[in-house]
Amino acid sequence: TYLLKKSYQHKTLKEINFKDLWGDKGVFTTMRILGKPTKILFFNSHIKNLIKSLKIYKLNRVGIKKDILKLIKLNVDNTKSYDHLLRVAVNNKMISVSLRERKTPKLEFNLKLINHKRIDPELKNLKYKLILKYLSKMDNTTSDVALCFKKKILESGTSNILFIKKNKIYSPSKNIYKGVTYIFFKKKIGKIINK
């Protein structure tokens, strides 16, 4: 369930009809927002990764970080209590901001294996239409997809996957997005073996 969906033109920041931008050339980040007063988990790291990806795709125009921060501030109500997911998506024409209800995963959770590797998987780009097609048919509190390529499990549709064997933790070495949560766990765990 969406609490908010808005899109804005670059530079002028004029509000326009909402587009989620899935499938476009562009990037996005999704951040957990919770509590009152509002806290966005790992906010600086998410924004840093977003700007880094914009630079790689040559979408990093002058002032874009300032505009993104302004739009987040505009759309987050500090008088509300949140437990939502805040998504910021950017292409060459607009910035889209949305807030949706966060669904808490249940302990009994399963993965549907699909033969798919994301385009430029090291980046959090908007080429997610096939993944979203599968996810839309699932109860996302109990199920996700696991992307497989050349007989290797890479990542889920929404998260990294870590494998545990004999008290050692493993992760694919390539064709995955090593996001903010992955980096957080790597620091906490101390060592993730890449294979």
Please provide the spans of the model-predicted regions.
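Non-catalytic, solvent-exposed interaction/assembly segments
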Residues: 78-80
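Short N-terminal helix-loop-first-beta-strand/juxtamembrane motif that initiates sensory/input modules
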Residues: 82-84, 143-144
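Helix-start/capping segments and mature chain N-termini
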Residues: 1-74, 91-195
